[in-house]
Amino acid sequence: MSDKFKLLLKQIHFPQHEEAYNEIKSGSIESVKLFKSKRQWFFVFSFRNLLSYETFTLFDNLLHSSFDSLGAKVSYMINVEDISCDQSLLEAYFSYALDILKSSHFSIYSLFSNLGIEISNNSISVKAPAHILRENLHERFIALIADVLSNVGLSNVSISVLEDKEASSSLEEAYETNKISLQEEAESQARQALQSIVQSSPVPPPQKHQAQNFAEKQSQRVASFDKAEITPMIEVNSEENRIVFEGYIFDVEQRETKTGRIIINFKVTDYTSSFAMQRWVKDSEELVKFGMIKKGNWVRVRGRIENNPFTHSLTMNVQDIKEISHTPRKDLMPEGQKRVEFHAHTNMSTMDAIPTVEELIDTAAFWGHPAVAITDHANVQSFPHGYHKAKKAGIKAIFGLEANLVEDKVPIVYNSENLELKEATYVVFDVETTGLSAVHNDLIQIAASKMHKGNIVEQFDEFIDPGYPLSAFTTELTGITDNHVKGAKPLVQVLQEFQEFCKGAVLVAHNATFDVGFMNANYERHQLPTISQPVIDTLEFARNLYPEYKRHGLGPLTKRFGVALDHHHMANYDAEATGRLLFIFIKDVFEKHGLTNLEQLNTELVSDDSYKKSRVKHATLYVQNQTGLKNIFKLVSLSNVSYFEGVARIPRKVLDEYREGIIVGSACADGEVFDTLLSHGIDKAVEVAKYYDFIEVMPPAIYAPLIAKDLIKDEGAIEQLIRDLIEVANRLDKPVLATGNVHYINPEDAIYREIIVRALGQGAMINRPIGKEENAQPAPLPEAHFRTTNEMLDEFAFLGKDLAYEIVVANTQAMANQIEEVEVVKKDLYTPYIDRAEEQVAEMTYAKAFELYGNPLPDIIDLRIEKELSSILGNGFAVIYLASQMLVNRSNERGYLVGSRGSVGSSFVATMIGITEVNPMPPHYLCPKCQHSEFITDGSYGSGFDLPDKECSECGTEYKKDGQDIPFETFLGFDGDKVPDIDLNFSGDDQPSAHLDVRDIFGEQYAFRAGTVGTVADRTAYGFVKGYERDYNKFYRDAEVDRLAMGVAGVKRNTGQHPGGIVVIPNYMDVYDFTPVQYPADDVTAAWQTTHFNFHDIDENVLKLDILGHDDPTMIRKLQDLSGIDPKDIRADDPDVMKLFSGTEVLGVTPEQIGTSTGVLGIPEFGTNFVRGMVEETHPTTFAELLQLSGLSHGTDVWLGNAQDLIKEGIATLKTVIGCRDDIMVYLMHAGLDPKMAFTIMERVRKGMWLKISEEERNGYIQAMRENNVPDWYIESCGKIKYMFPKAHAAAYVMMALRVAYFKVHHPIYYYCAYFSIRAKAFELKTMSAGLDAVKARMEDIKEKRQRNEATNLENDLFTTLEIVNEMLERGFTFGQLDLYKSQATEFLIEGDTLIPPFIALEGLGENVAKQLVAAREEGEFLSKTELRKRGGLSSTLVERLDEMGILGNMPEDNQLSLFDDFF
């Protein structure tokens, strides 16, 4: 005890009795401060241990009372060396903190004082209702409590506030109930007041009519509701009473409270905004009155707008609601006079359009349009769905796309001549203009430098007055002001002088097509000769000379080559800089390629892939007939596979090659006809338009963004452009089609596209900012909704009625009539051809059957094979079976087992030829010596593995046992004609080889990965909406955010590939008969091409093999390699293995040691928390019961709320509940139902259709079931099921799981080695090697984080690993440290009873580095850390980590030893 502290204790009269004084005397005063003016003292005390609560309160009371008696104040803070404390002490200190809070912050105290508190292990958890969390009041509470506890020495206590969902629900219900009771009370008081007024008033004379009854009052209320003024939702931003809205319900959720009341939460939009609404309903009877509250309905609602304390947003509490009719937009033109839309995008246009193809076609059909075209950007992924939908809707679908057309080779030199590059004279020029259109904009500066052999010999620089003030945009971009151009020479004079300046020279410009185009347009306008001398485009020169550069603009090039460019976008500076670059290029092209002549630049420098840098122009391509469909498929494939560069491109020569059967339209403002017209005028546009079959014109509103971009002056100019486009078509006698460039259906949907497009960021061309700095904004998006005929005619009314009708209706109908109906998706299955496939399958089947069951075969086997082969061979499925057998056999030969998935195990033929290990026959005995067999067909056993052991009645050999009792019908349907879906689980290590096997068997040109289309997910859509809200200064209430996110979700974002699916095209056809192809995610370096269509769209037409990678076969292979035990020799009924499912004794541990009451941790199929819980509830003892569990765990609404309740209530057992789909058919047939009906019932139940079929059909099934004594609980259970797992799939999984479990029981060190090498996802070596206490402590730490929802994904994975680590340690095995010379790269190493971890188990050390490290140590010992970093490929951080763990021992930093070290 310090002297100062001893003196303090004496002054406050601290009693020196033994217990308290002995505890506190270890203290000392670290510091003390005195604030004289406030008479306030502040102490910092230090104690070795935390004071007991009794000693602390005694000290605290004496300290405060002593200073109070002196008229002074005191406060303090305590520091403690050892801050550990037990639960009771922490509870006491927490109570003290609450008391302090009560006196200082009563409002916070009152909220938290009566809440549930959980205290343990230096952590305090408080459960609070949701509104406290939403108001962030818990953060203030945590801070205050933590401050108090820290001051008394408890600085390490973790405090968290979690939501008490039960309390939240009860409070919300109480809140609503209280509101209702208050309302009723107020109404009662009003009635009483009214009654007293009436009683005190004189009696009125008799009236002719009696007072209104309740029904009349209600009628008046309804009438007032019907006539009430409708308020737009956007106008309501605060609490209000009796507001009336009308809108569309887009989301509904209802739930029942504990008291039986029902709350209906729904969301409504009127497309100005959206509101969350709720209606409380007393019971299910009253709920019927509110049947109109369902998604998709339009309603009128009246209610109070209140700030909901639980959602923290404005919510309408609905008082009145009624369904209203809503009339969607209609096409009012008479039948036969309706347009055809020829330019429409669906949500398959990547991040650009909203409607599904079904919505587009439905709208066109509803309007009575005879046809509608699909023209997505550069893809045809909506074709299959569009094809099926159009057939269903009775409308012609026109299949097309908006392609990216590029020139094959873009020249460097125009008007080329035979000139030596080093000897020529060049005029390097640049122009500045008021816009990008040579027709609609004007020249304001021409500047040039005449250069010879790198030197400037003369310059030209003239401004030109356009005759009107320059726009702010022009001045901002070019730096040219009205003062520059005012009083300048006339344009014609400048043009003449410039022509004279250029005589005898080669012209040079950067992006010469623009500058030359502008000059020629002005020359023509003033009857001057156009440019005829050679022109070098330095942009294309740079692209071909430096293809490795990503950017070839003037700015980036001058920076790269150190050329000055002081005022970019002023012509004189740009021209001089371009000239300097030209002579650098001339020098480099000679040194790199030996080129000296102007003509050589085009013939020898322009590369074959110059299309990659060529400017993309849009063109619309349409399928005219079946030949055209295949050619479109080829074009899409080539554009994605051979010509992809940023986007899928189609070179003009490629389009020419495959143009048969295709109609080509001129597309939108990004098409070359429109661009040429805008830039060069009608004559040039006519030349370009010759390539196209028709010319598109679009509503002026579609072109309106060009005004914002300063490409067009005003709406009048847009109308003139449309007239000019029609003139172009008329000169060529080509039809003009008015198209809408549709990107969404209704005008109010524009916001969805706005959000999607802006989510692309400013890097996207469509979002390029106009203006600079704070004025920079992207151009507005056009009004691109689907227009009716009337709306379209109105858009073109300025052309006159007849011309408008011609381009809107007559021409579009005529063009649609030229297009034939095509078959996009074929009707039949086309399997590849393998020679003698049918014979091979039959021969292999019978050969194996004879080997196992003898010849002649037992009748039950013979009939089953005959039945299956009849279906398999008769429907052309033999090749599917044979291909699967070949793949499995090849993997087996490489040493891997292959697990089957799905229902293939229902086929006995599949079993016989080696596709699956699952035997679907009824449970049976089979003699391995004499082939005698006994079948159990009465349903008494669910699996042959559960039969009691028995010796052969013929020869005395112990029988083998097999058979899972699975009908063949569950695989290929009752009539055996369903396309077989054979899914196989290959080892993840062997999967790549299995994929290559498919190519080897069928040919590379016939095997493709199954393609997928990735769309905007719900959470991503929500993020897009919030991002738009942030970036564009919007504010949306929560319901509106939800509505917008729903509108945005589903838009195509990318493409990908199925993890294991491979599509096989028949070798007598080609892939373009079915689908285009591409690379996944546009990765042209990928090893495999994929189907362009989502594979589900063609899975009934071509063979799809699911060759999936799975851990189970890899694990089995690892265990076989470690033990030498053949996994096929492991019995499925090992009694010790079965004990894992009922306890832990077989592992030699107690439940308390491993934290679970069974031994299934880490066992495939049974090791998850969910299934472990099922195992603990049911304690399965047979293989059949394990199959049940597998089915129950994989199904939907099969266990929870169904079988689980039946078992708990003693109504059924694990054996008798419905587990797998096949069990239904087998059970019902054993009960006496007709097999066909049993099969149909199974199909209805497994797909969740039981309650969706007609009542008449369902009652027929129920009657048949009851007549055959099927219990009611079974029938009711059928009605709850949404999805069921195939028994064959369950059997395959359980067989694999039991093999793994065998090693866990009998060869544990092998099991743990395999588990950690293959299945574990996260490691923490420091913890794993520190022993049981450290492992258990870390697990508790993660558990606490989970309770607070603070655990990371990595920690959750680590917890799973640590569960197995804990079990392994409890069983007496240990983890060693990483060893620089023993550890493997990726797999654990067994050393006695110890596992040595691999290098990848170290955080931050990846597989490639681990392999490099192992390879490096083979070359020799690491003599220093420096050498370890260099040869081993380790970062400094990893070397430091290894050193900290003691793995490097005394390894020096470097190995530059002194000369004398070798003597010691």
Curated annotation (Swiss-Prot):
<keyword id="KW-0808">Transferase</keyword>
<dbReference type="Pfam" id="PF00929">
    <property type="entry name" value="RNase_T"/>
</dbReference>
<dbReference type="InterPro" id="IPR029460">
    <property type="entry name" value="DNAPol_HHH"/>
</dbReference>
<keyword id="KW-0269">Exonuclease</keyword>
<dbReference type="Pfam" id="PF17657">
    <property type="entry name" value="DNA_pol3_finger"/>
</dbReference>
<keyword id="KW-0239">DNA-directed DNA polymerase</keyword>
<dbReference type="InterPro" id="IPR004805">
    <property type="entry name" value="DnaE2/DnaE/PolC"/>
</dbReference>
<dbReference type="InterPro" id="IPR024754">
    <property type="entry name" value="DNA_PolC-like_N_II"/>
</dbReference>
<keyword id="KW-0235">DNA replication</keyword>
<dbReference type="Pfam" id="PF02811">
    <property type="entry name" value="PHP"/>
</dbReference>
<dbReference type="InterPro" id="IPR044923">
    <property type="entry name" value="PolC_middle_finger_sf"/>
</dbReference>
<dbReference type="InterPro" id="IPR012337">
    <property type="entry name" value="RNaseH-like_sf"/>
</dbReference>
<keyword id="KW-0378">Hydrolase</keyword>
<feature type="domain" description="Exonuclease">
    <location>
        <begin position="426"/>
        <end position="582"/>
    </location>
</feature>
<dbReference type="InterPro" id="IPR036397">
    <property type="entry name" value="RNaseH_sf"/>
</dbReference>
<dbReference type="InterPro" id="IPR011708">
    <property type="entry name" value="DNA_pol3_alpha_NTPase_dom"/>
</dbReference>
<dbReference type="InterPro" id="IPR012340">
    <property type="entry name" value="NA-bd_OB-fold"/>
</dbReference>
<dbReference type="InterPro" id="IPR013520">
    <property type="entry name" value="Exonuclease_RNaseT/DNA_pol3"/>
</dbReference>
<dbReference type="InterPro" id="IPR003141">
    <property type="entry name" value="Pol/His_phosphatase_N"/>
</dbReference>
<dbReference type="Pfam" id="PF14480">
    <property type="entry name" value="DNA_pol3_a_NI"/>
</dbReference>
<dbReference type="InterPro" id="IPR028112">
    <property type="entry name" value="DNA_PolC-type_N_I"/>
</dbReference>
<dbReference type="InterPro" id="IPR040982">
    <property type="entry name" value="DNA_pol3_finger"/>
</dbReference>
<dbReference type="GO" id="GO:0005737">
    <property type="term" value="C:cytoplasm"/>
</dbReference>
<keyword id="KW-0963">Cytoplasm</keyword>
<comment type="function">
    <text>Required for replicative DNA synthesis. This DNA polymerase also exhibits 3' to 5' exonuclease activity.</text>
</comment>
<comment type="similarity">
    <text>Belongs to the DNA polymerase type-C family. PolC subfamily.</text>
</comment>
<keyword id="KW-0540">Nuclease</keyword>
<protein>
    <recommendedName>
        <fullName>DNA polymerase III PolC-type</fullName>
        <ecNumber>2.7.7.7</ecNumber>
    </recommendedName>
</protein>
<dbReference type="InterPro" id="IPR004013">
    <property type="entry name" value="PHP_dom"/>
</dbReference>
<dbReference type="GO" id="GO:0003677">
    <property type="term" value="F:DNA binding"/>
</dbReference>
<dbReference type="InterPro" id="IPR006054">
    <property type="entry name" value="DnaQ"/>
</dbReference>
<dbReference type="GO" id="GO:0008408">
    <property type="term" value="F:3'-5' exonuclease activity"/>
</dbReference>
<dbReference type="GO" id="GO:0006261">
    <property type="term" value="P:DNA-templated DNA replication"/>
</dbReference>
<keyword id="KW-0548">Nucleotidyltransferase</keyword>
<dbReference type="Pfam" id="PF07733">
    <property type="entry name" value="DNA_pol3_alpha"/>
</dbReference>
<dbReference type="GO" id="GO:0003887">
    <property type="term" value="F:DNA-directed DNA polymerase activity"/>
</dbReference>
<dbReference type="InterPro" id="IPR006308">
    <property type="entry name" value="Pol_III_a_PolC-type_gram_pos"/>
</dbReference>
<dbReference type="Pfam" id="PF14579">
    <property type="entry name" value="HHH_6"/>
</dbReference>
<dbReference type="Pfam" id="PF11490">
    <property type="entry name" value="DNA_pol3_a_NII"/>
</dbReference>
